[in-house]
Amino acid sequence: MNIKPLGDKVVIKKVEAEDKTKSGIVLPGSAKEQPQMAEVVAVGPGGVVEGKEIIMELKVGDKVIFSKYAGTEVKLDGEEYTILRQNDILAVVE
């Protein structure tokens, strides 16, 4: 099953947080930070959203940094994704 976002929406898959600190301390699940890095897996067509022309600047495969608590988390075929607006993407990592 595929997710096809509408308008200015983007579907991302989060990159998991590290299990250990740089000094080698193992972190329990509750101590890990909410990941803010992800890979873009689907991009909406853009168009006119709330009266403004939106041109999509992202493409599938981009590595991005996004707002910490942005978007809606969904589970599909056992995989977790986040759907958010292109505005919630802060940067593309090259």
Curated annotation (Swiss-Prot):
Q: Which PANTHER family does the record associate with it?
A: 10 KDA HEAT SHOCK PROTEIN (PTHR10772), CO-CHAPERONIN GROES (PTHR10772:SF58)
Tell me, what does this protein do in biology?
Together with the chaperonin GroEL, plays an essential role in assisting protein folding. The GroEL-GroES system forms a nano-cage that allows encapsulation of the non-native substrate proteins and provides a physical environment optimized to promote and accelerate protein folding. GroES binds to the apical surface of the GroEL ring, thereby capping the opening of the GroEL channel.
Keywords of the record, alphabetical order, are: Chaperone, Cytoplasm
Q: Which family does it belong to?
A: Belongs to the GroES chaperonin family.
Species whose genome carries this gene: Alkaliphilus metalliredigens (strain QYMF)
Q: What is this protein called?
A: Co-chaperonin GroES
Task: Name the GO cellular-component terms.
Answer: cytoplasm
Instruction: Tell me what gene encodes this.
Output: groES
Gene3D superfamilies named in the record? GroES chaperonin (2.30.33.40)
Where in or outside the cell? Cytoplasm
Major location, coarse class?
Answer: cytoplasm
Instruction: State any single GO MF term.
Output: protein folding chaperone
One Pfam family in the UniProt entry: Cpn10
What InterPro entries does the entry give?
Chaperonin_GroES, Chaperonin_GroES_sf, Chaprnonin_Cpn10_CS, GroES-like_sf
Q: How does it assemble?
A: Heptamer of 7 subunits arranged in a ring. Interacts with the chaperonin GroEL.
